């Protein structure tokens, strides 16, 4: 009798190998050899959580009444704070009882929303390239993915319209993420107005991930899809405190908008979790309602890192564009290396420049001409990385001439 394998599990069989693990394993091996690897691979903020938020966590944790099971939807005070945040920031009125739910990070919320709403035979539209949970959260639920190209020189909305018309069965849901990971792509409010119009015409739910709303540069202001009139009839929006407040390990997010989708996620979560630790939720209230200087300081830090990296790569002979938002630089592979593809080029950067990046193919087939830099190294280390890359390019050019 043969031993059962993980591949025997139907949901696991639908998930491809995780491309990023290949680079992660090589990175770990290099470090084990004593090599100094400058790591731009994961979008994992490197700075501590602002002290006033940590202090509130400690204060709440020292209370005797905060250590019991919490509420899977989030404590009422946090849901009210979330709705005030939307009102103050976007002038959007939300009901904390029916239009807001706390999630254990955006990934948990997206995955459980997909399980609540979709199943085999359902179709979902997702940009490509995309943050992996956006397609694969729905793949896990058994849904089928229709990829919509999000690439330079192609009108994404036109492609979205084509996908809606050409798909059968008709898509049940559309997932968006602007400002986008990994591409840094940004939109204005009129884009969301067109999305809501076409979604309503075709009875398609819209899920928008607004994780990088605060990490916006050069005066750009990221809109919320809920600012569109009538959006609440058909859309929800996720937000995470991970990037705005340097709280990635805390796992605090929320979803707001359409009452039907909020209720569906709440029902699913009622079977799966008791919500996050109450002191974390109390600290999240402090984050949203306390001083916001920290958010601006975090944004400015990423902007400085963006400028150092992009200016350095351009000077080194690797043409890249400065993104208007996010903590990522989506860099097209230099022409002389383009045929390698993103995975092999990422391996080369690790071996020859001691720099770790994420291969673009890990975000979808339309990302294979790119690599993603996460702005998680300080300016000094970023300059060091640029020097290593410049030397690699110079050395390779010299060898090709020989």
Locate each region found by the language model.
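A glycine-/small-polar-enriched, mobile loop at the entrance of the PLP active site in fold-type I
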Residues: 41-44, 59-79, 88-89
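PLP-dependent class I/II
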Residues: 1-8, 13-18, 25, 29-38, ...
């Amino acid at each position: 009798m043969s031993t059962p394998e993980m591949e025997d599990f139907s949901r696991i069989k639908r998930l491809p190998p995780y491309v990023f693990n290949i680079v992660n394993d090589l990175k770990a091996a290099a470090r084990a050899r004593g090599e100094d690897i400058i790591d731009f691979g994961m979008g994992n903020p490197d700075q501590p959580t602002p002290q006033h938020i940590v202090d509130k966590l400690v204060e709440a944790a020292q209370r005797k009444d905060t250590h019991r099971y919490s509420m899977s939807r989030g404590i009422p005070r946090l849901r009210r704070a979330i709705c005030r945040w939307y009102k103050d920031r976007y002038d959007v009125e939300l009901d904390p009882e029916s239009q807001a739910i706390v999630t254990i990070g955006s990934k948990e919320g997206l995955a459980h929303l997909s399980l609540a709403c979709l199943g085999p035979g359902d179709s979902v539209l997702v940009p490509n390239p995309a943050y992996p949970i956006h397609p694969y959260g729905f793949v896990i639920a058994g849904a089928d993915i229709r990829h919509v190209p999000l690439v330079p020189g192609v009108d994404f909305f036109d492609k979205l319209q084509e996908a809606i018309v050409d798909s059968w069965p008709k898509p049940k849901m559309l997932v968006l993420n602007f400002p986008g990971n990994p591409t840094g792509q940004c939109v204005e409010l009129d884009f969301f107005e067109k999305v809501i119009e076409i979604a309503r015409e075709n009875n398609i739910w819209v899920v928008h991930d607004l994780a990088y709303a605060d990490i916006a540069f050069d005066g750009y202001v990221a809109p919320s899809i809920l600012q569109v009139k009538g959006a609440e009839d058909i859309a929800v929006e996720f937000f995470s405190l991970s990037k705005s407040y340097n709280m990635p390990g805390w796992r605090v997010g929320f979803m707001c908008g359409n009452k039907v989708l909020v209720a569906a996620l709440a029902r699913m979560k009622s079977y799966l979790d008791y919500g996050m630790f109450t002191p974390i939720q109390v600290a999240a209230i402090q984050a949203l309602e306390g001083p916001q200087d920290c958010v601006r300081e975090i944004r400015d830090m990423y902007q400085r890192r963006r400028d150092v990296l992009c200016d350095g790569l351009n000077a080194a002979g690797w043409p890249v564009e400065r993104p208007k938002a996010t903590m990522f630089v989506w860099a097209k592979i230099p022409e002389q290396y383009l045929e390698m593809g993103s995975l092999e080029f990422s391996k080369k950067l690790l071996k020859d420049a001691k720099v770790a990046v994420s291969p673009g193919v890990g975000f979808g087939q339309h990302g294979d001409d790119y690599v993603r830099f996460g702005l998680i190294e300080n300016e000094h280390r970023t300059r060091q990385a640029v020097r290593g890359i410049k030397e690699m390019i110079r050395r390779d050019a010299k060898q090709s001439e020989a």
